Amino acid sequence: MNATCRLIGPAIAAALVLLPSLASSQAAGAQRLAWLQGCWRIDAGSRIVEEQWSAPRGGTLLGSSRTVRDGKTVEHEFVILRETAEGRLAYEVSPSGRAPTVFTSISLDDAGVVFENLQHDFPQRVAYQRKGDDLLAWIEGPARNAPGQLRRIEYPYRKVACTGEP
C-alpha cells in the first residue's frame, strides 16, 4: 500500500464522522431563530408595521412585512433567511419589488442575530434581538450627508396573534 492510499482511508473516515455534525450545526443555525416565528407589530399613530415569520424548516425561515400609513400599504418586503454552505445564515431581502440584497450573519446567539453587507449603500447591517416577549429589529449603515457617522433605525415590535384581523 502506498503513502497516498494510507492517507486517503483515514481522511475519508474523518469526513464521514465530521459531515453529520457539520450538517447538524448548520441546521441549528436556522433553529436558533425559532423564537422569531410568528407575528410582530408596531403601532405608531397612522403608521402600522407588521412582520410575520414562518417556523424554521429545511434550513430556512420565510418572512414578510408591510408598512401601512393612513390605510395604504406604502412599503413591503419579502425575506428568505437561509443557511449557507459556509455554516452561516444569509438574509435575502426584496424590499418593495426591488432586486434582492443578501446580508450574511456576523453574529448569532440565542438572543439575536446580526447580518452584514458592507457593499450595500444602506443599510449595511440588519439585526433582530429578542427582548423578553418583544423584538427589537434595527438597520444601520453610513449616514447620508455625514461622512464617518452611522445612521441607525430601530423597530420595536411587540408579538401579536396571527389572526389576520386589523
Give the residues covered by each predicted segment.
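N-terminal secretory signal peptides that target proteins for export/translocation
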Residues: M1-C5
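Bacterial N-terminal signal peptides
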Residues: G9-S21
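N-terminal helix-cap/turn-to-beta initiation motif at the start of protein domains
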Residues: Q26-C39
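Central antiparallel beta-sheet cores of small beta-barrel/beta-sandwich binding domains
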Residues: Q37, I42-Q119
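Edge beta-strand at a domain terminus
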Residues: P100-S105, D110, R130-L136, E140-P166
